[in-house]
Amino acid sequence: MGAANDAVDGRELMSAAVVGRTISRIAHQIIEKTALDSPDSPRVVLLGIPTRGVILASRLAANIGEYSGIEVDHGALDITLYRDDLMSKPPRPLEETEIPAGGVDDALVILVDDVLYSGRSVRSALDALRDVGRPRSVQLAVLVDRGHRELPVRADYVGKNVPTARSESVHVQFSEHDGHDGVVISR
């Protein structure tokens, strides 16, 4: 997706304002679907898939805390060594896995990624999660679902469904990494 300040030419799908509203909406959906304010609600842990999934998880946790008054643990789950394309792509540096102090055992873990495409990153995340602990259940939240699944994966929380051609790319941009917020589609 490029390093910070790399320009991505293409058509804007979501402005910074729309990205903010979309994250807010996903946070509200998580609060409602998990019944976070109920005493029977499981502990919720948001685990972002590096790089932009970690940023999205952090923003979702902040929004959930603001709207519900409940602090939600969040962290990062590196999937590099669990990918099925390690031999066919250039080497990637390992990212940091940061599991909250309470761990993930018996928690509702929500995996968070910026774009859902083939489903292979999610499969890798499930494999990585298995090595970290045993959650009660696992859900998936994504900012953009662009279709073209190769594995039977469906997100529980989707910011925007964007039908794309396989020749197109969807680039999510966050100010923490890219200098500004937005979503761009390019060829």
UniProtKB/Swiss-Prot annotation:
Keyword hit for Transcription regulation: yes
Organism of this sequence: Mycobacterium ulcerans (strain Agy99)
Similarity-based family: Belongs to the purine/pyrimidine phosphoribosyltransferase family. PyrR subfamily.
GO MF, any single term: uracil phosphoribosyltransferase activity
Keyword annotations of the record: Glycosyltransferase, Transcription, Transcription regulation, Transferase
UniProt short sequence motif PRPP-binding, positions renumbered to this chain: 109-121
One GO process term, biological-process aspect: regulation of DNA-templated transcription
Record's catalysed reaction(s): UMP + diphosphate = 5-phospho-alpha-D-ribose 1-diphosphate + uracil
Signal sequence interval, chain numbering: none
EC number: 2.4.2.9
Record protein name field: Bifunctional protein PyrR
Gene3D superfamilies for the chain: 3.40.50.2020
Enzyme class: transferase
Function: Regulates the transcription of the pyrimidine nucleotide (pyr) operon in response to exogenous pyrimidines. Also displays a weak uracil phosphoribosyltransferase activity which is not physiologically significant.
Gene transcribed to yield this protein: pyrR
